[in-house]
């Protein structure tokens, strides 16, 4: 949704204006004005992209794009992300500890975790990298900030980024009940090789109690250093590298929600790209965190803890099911974020699209299932409103897609669109104009399902998903155009399928792989599928970026397909490892002027926007 939870305009509808007045597309984001990190960024004149383990600067301001500089990051960049603001870039890299051995330095560009975090730290490390873009021919890393933890997600508004990090406690060795189970006592009671469920449960309960006592003692003996994330800051702004290290958060900035939602530490860091990279002015909250959503005013982090009753077939149904806890942070200030409230909804969330703020309230779409029994599945749309430090549920509608799971969701203005699927695809329209009384007002049942929904005009939504049979068998990739101008009667106007039953697209689970260019009514998505050759009995892997023209009257028409050149086969290492080649996967599309650029790990290709004909190829160096 864009603006205030879905008000016009929508992200992607209105082109951005570059410094030279050239229209260009940015990252496909959920909220207008709230940037999301991605593996490629542009301002209409410059393109920053990850590929082959490097950051590449491509000048797109001239008649043809030109590679100006590449920066070796010493890290895998497949899931790397970044923000770009004026002459600074903030890179977000997931890394793992490198232990080269005593007295052996870590590889170039990697942190010696053994030196800084100790030999007992084996979890993930988040690396924030500040890059100076002033001289494209000589890109420079100004500073690195290494944090013990994993990136959950990030957002940026007007050059101020909020980075959400989840850090598990370190140096604490828990004991699971299975480690304390007295198998000798159990076998002495029932006999070797015999099974007795009642006796087993008795001994399991004893082990569970021992585990609780043991782990509580571990917690009681722990120190603050076990709970707070650690950091190493590397300043490369001038002369030899300067290092500092310590705890990322102060105790005064760590909060505890009124509901238990895990033992990890959530850190919300504030990094202003107009200033140098410091320690992030973090605020902490004891909680797990998996899903991040942000409006211009608030950032929400959601987590769905494991419920042990779901694995117990004898548990009371009232004890089963899932609960999602949502934590709210005020980000209106350009300075430190502020934790303000927490709330809960029944069920689990599909993705960030399951949350949307509108007129101060948070709408949440969720699916709940009791234990492993899928016949109990049911979906809900709930509305939470802040009251002090609580987010109270003020309205809810349930009964959506019974026995099914949410596969796609989008809130636009005062309406929610929820797709569930098991056999057919019900597209529900949910009226949330009265937040205290949300109501399902329309339903459309069709084969297949849409995993991603995107507004493409007044009363029109484009869906990207999978086709299917009436029996629920999923087939190839599908693009559908829906008319939702009448909430009570949504209609599928057009659909097209592409590929075969093995078809797949990154756009199914990552909206940033989807491009909508409203100016010409064109959408582009990456697609992959395999074909079986009966003559050779071999499978071939096909892939490319496909462009479609979308029109209410004319339907969905294929404009063309873009493919990248095959890389040169790898040189022979020996007779067993010779000539290995691979097909680059096209992952992103963006528009600048009358060109559409597609990105793979090996390069950028510029094609004509009108017909997707080849124009220019920029290969990334090895």
Q: Can you describe what each PLM-predicted range is?
A:
Residues 1-622:
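Beta-sheet-rich non-transmembrane sensory/scaffold domains
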């Amino acid at each position: 949704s864009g603006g205030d939870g879905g008000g016009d305009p929508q992200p992607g509808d209105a082109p951005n204006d570059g410094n030279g007045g050239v229209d260009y597309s940015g990252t496909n984001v959920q909220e207008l004005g709230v940037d999301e990190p991605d593996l490629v960024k542009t301002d209409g004149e410059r393109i920053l992209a990850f590929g082959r383990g490097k950051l590449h600067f491509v000048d797109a301001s001239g008649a043809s794009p030109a590679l100006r500089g590449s920066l070796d990051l010493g890290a895998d960049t497949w899931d790397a992300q970044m923000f770009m603001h004026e002459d600074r870039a903030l890179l977000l890299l997931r890394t793992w500890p490198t232990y080269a051995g005593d007295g052996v330095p870590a590889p170039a560009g990697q942190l010696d975790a053994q030196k800084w975090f100790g030999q007992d730290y084996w979890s993930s490390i988040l690396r924030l990298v500040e890059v100076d873009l002033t001289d494209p021919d000589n890109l420079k890393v100004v500073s690195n900030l290494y944090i013990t933890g994993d990136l959950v997600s990030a957002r940026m508004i007007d050059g101020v980024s909020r980075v959400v990090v989840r850090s598990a406690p370190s140096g604490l060795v828990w004991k699971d009940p299975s480690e304390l189970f007295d198998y000798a006592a159990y076998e002495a009671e029932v006999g070797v090789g015999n099974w007795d469920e009642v006796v087993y449960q008795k001994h399991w309960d004893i082990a569970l109690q021992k585990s609780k006592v043991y782990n509580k003692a571990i917690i009681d003996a722990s120190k603050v250093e076990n709970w707070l994330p650690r950091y190493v800051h590397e300043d490369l702004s001038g002369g030899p590298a300067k290092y500092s290290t310590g705890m990322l958060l102060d105790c005064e900035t760590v909060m505890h929600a009124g509901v238990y939602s895990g033992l990890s530490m959530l850190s919300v860091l504030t990094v202003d790209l107009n200033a140098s990279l410091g320690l992030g002015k973090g605020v902490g909250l004891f909680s797990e965190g998996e899903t991040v959503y942000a409006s211009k005013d608030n950032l929400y982090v959601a987590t769905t803890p494991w419920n042990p009753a779901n694995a117990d077939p004898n548990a009371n149904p009232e004890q089963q099911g899932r609960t999602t806890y949502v934590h709210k942070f005020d980000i209106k200030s350009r300075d430190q974020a502020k934790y303000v409230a927490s709330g809960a909804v029944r069920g689990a969330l599909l993705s960030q699209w399951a949350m949307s703020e509108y007129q101060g309230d948070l709408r949440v779409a969720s699916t709940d299932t009791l234990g492993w029994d899928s016949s109990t599945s049911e979906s809900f749309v709930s509305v939470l409103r802040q009251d002090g430090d609580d987010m109270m549920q003020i309205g809810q509608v349930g009964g959506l897609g019974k026995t099914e799971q949410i596969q796609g969701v989008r809130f636009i203005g005062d309406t929610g669109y929820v797709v569930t699927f098991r056999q057919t695809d019900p597209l529900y329209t949910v009226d949330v104009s009265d937040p205290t009384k949300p109501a399902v007002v329309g339903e459309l049942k069709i084969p297949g399902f849409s995993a991603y929904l995107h507004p493409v005009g007044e009363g029109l939504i484009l869906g990207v998903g999978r086709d299917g049979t009436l029996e629920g068998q999923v087939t190839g990739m599908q693009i559908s155009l829906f008319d939702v101008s009448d909430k009570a009667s949504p209609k599928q106007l057009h659909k097209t399928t592409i590929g075969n039953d093995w078809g797949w697209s990154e756009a199914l689970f990552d909206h940033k792989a989807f491009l909508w260019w409203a100016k010409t009514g064109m959408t582009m998505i990456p697609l992959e599928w395999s074909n079986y050759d009966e003559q050779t009995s071999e499978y071939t892997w096909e892939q490319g970026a496909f462009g479609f023209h979308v029109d209410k009257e004319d339907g969905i028409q294929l404009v063309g397909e873009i493919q990248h050149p095959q890389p040169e086969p790898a040189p022979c290492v020996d007779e067993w490892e010779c000539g290995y080649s691979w097909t680059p996967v096209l992952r992103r599309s963006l528009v600048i002027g009358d060109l559409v650029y597609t990105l793979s790990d090996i390069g950028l290709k510029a094609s004509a926007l009108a017909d997707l004909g080849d124009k220019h190829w920029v290969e990334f160096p090895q």
